[in-house]
């Protein structure tokens, strides 16, 4: 029935989770799937029952304060090139050994290059065509020129794929607008397929059971602090959220998820109206029950916020261009507010949460975009495109 070779980016779980969903659907119809990745994504893929070939990591450096480390990332450039070359070699061997009908990359360039070398069709799923510099660096004209030049070069490399799929809404509602627009080398190849996050709507009975087991009062506001991204950046936001909770009205309830895929799935009650998960196995239920989401700014979690019709307070990783771009667009669309991590205090976070909770226009706008998103089934659109090659 055909074989698809899936190659998601290894940092965080968003890239891997959407390809696993596609692979699950293919497997139901008798098609086969193989994976390659690195880091947390590889562990997740194995946990979901698939074999995963490990490849050399190509990732940025992060500070323990929760930010993107420009200095350390620049120092890693020689290692990036070395590991990228290793990735291309590894992927070429892996793909040549199994001869798939199609290679499906999620935000990784090496599988696209390997597929091109082997003359095998390839699809790339991408919500960041170019690398955005931090706002501080972009104040310099030479930095903006550099960003544009690198963006066009990267665009030409991504365009080696037969199809370039953007898991987002079409303009003017594109969340990743800052990361994918205005790049001539890929502009004609971009296909907006809709969000590729699962369309799960927990039953009211299931949510009532969960609320009862945790002791959540459905008549009082519930804030879900869902932390994701590189491990080094998570705890800084978790600690900030814990401090902000103490400053807010006790009636405002909190659920905090550390986002550790290997963590304890059992909740810990940390205050009269606050619960803490190392890994939250009931994330969808908590999303649906919440009145407000506190998120980093990753594309997958923001997509889910829109699909559930929830307003947000985003705290993007400092100097993380993609998350800053996504968060800025969310704020521009009226879906919530963005707070910069650098210098952010618990009082400011508490004020931001109170601000969004007290203004119904944020909720109204989130529900408006939810209705638009419901018209596009991203996972099914990707699935049909992959199936066309099998």
Predicted feature residues:
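A short, glycine/small-residue-rich beta-strand->loop->alpha-helix junction that serves as a flexible
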Residues: 8-20, 232-235
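Donor-nucleotide binding loops and adjacent catalytic segments primarily
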Residues: 23, 197-292, 324
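Conserved nucleotide-sugar phosphate-binding/catalytic loop shared by glycosyltransferases and other
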Residues: 28-29, 34-83, 226
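Conserved nucleotide-sugar donor-binding subdomain of glycosyltransferases
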Residues: 69-102, 108-110
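A donor-sugar binding/catalytic signature common to diverse glycosyltransferases
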Residues: 102-106, 282-326
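A nucleotide-sugar donor-handling region in carbohydrate enzymes
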Residues: 142-232, 259-262
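Conserved donor-nucleotide binding/catalytic region of nucleotide-linked donor-dependent transferases
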Residues: 336-337, 342, 347-348, 352-369, ...
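C-terminal alpha-helical cap of glycosyltransferases
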Residues: 375-390
């Amino acid at each position: 029935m055909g074989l698809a070779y899936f190659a998601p980016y290894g940092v965080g779980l968003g890239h891997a989770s959407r390809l696993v969903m596609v692979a699950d659907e293919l497997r139901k119809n008798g098609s086969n799937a193989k994976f390659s990745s690195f880091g947390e994504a590889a562990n997740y893929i194995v946990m979901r029952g698939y074999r995963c070939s490990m490849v050399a990591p190509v990732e940025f450096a992060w500070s323990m304060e929760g930010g993107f480390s420009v200095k350390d990332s620049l120092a890693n450039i020689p290692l990036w090139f070395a590991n990228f070359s290793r990735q291309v070699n590894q992927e070429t061997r892996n793909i040549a050994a199994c001869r798939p009908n199609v290679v499906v990359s999620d935000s990784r360039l090496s599988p696209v290059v390997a597929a091109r070398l082997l003359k095998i069709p390839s699809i790339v799923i991408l919500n960041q065509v170019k690398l955005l510099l931090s706002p501080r660096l972009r104040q310099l004209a030479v930095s903006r020129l550099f960003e544009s030049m690198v963006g066009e070069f990267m665009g030409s490399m991504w365009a080696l794929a037969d199809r370039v799929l953007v898991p987002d809404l079409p303009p003017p509602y594109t969340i990743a607008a800052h990361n994918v627009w205005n790049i001539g080398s890929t502009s004609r190849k971009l296909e907006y397929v809709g969000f590729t996050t699962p369309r799960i709507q927990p039953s009211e009975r299931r949510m009532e059971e969960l609320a009862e087991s945790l002791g959540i009062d459905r008549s009082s506001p519930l804030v879900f602090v869902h932390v994701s991204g590189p491990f080094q950046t998570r705890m800084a936001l978790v600690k900030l959220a814990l401090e902000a909770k103490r400053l807010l009205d006790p009636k405002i309830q909190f659920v905090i998820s550390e986002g550790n895929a290997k963590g304890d799935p059992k909740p810990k009650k940390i205050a009269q109206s606050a619960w803490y998960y190392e890994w939250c196995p009931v994330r969808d239920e908590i999303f649906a029950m919440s009145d407000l989401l506190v998120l980093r700014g990753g594309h997958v979690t923001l997509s889910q916020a829109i699909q559930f019709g929830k307003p947000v307070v985003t705290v993007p990783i400092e100097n993380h261009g993609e998350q800053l771009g996504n968060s800025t667009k969310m704020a521009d669309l009226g879906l919530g507010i963005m707070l910069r991590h650098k210098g952010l205090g618990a009082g400011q976070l508490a004020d931001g949460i109170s601000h969004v909770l007290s203004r119904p226009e944020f909720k109204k706008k989130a529900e408006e975009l939810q209705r638009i998103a419901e018209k596009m089934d991203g996972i099914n659109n990707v699935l049909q495109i992959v199936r066309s090659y099998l």
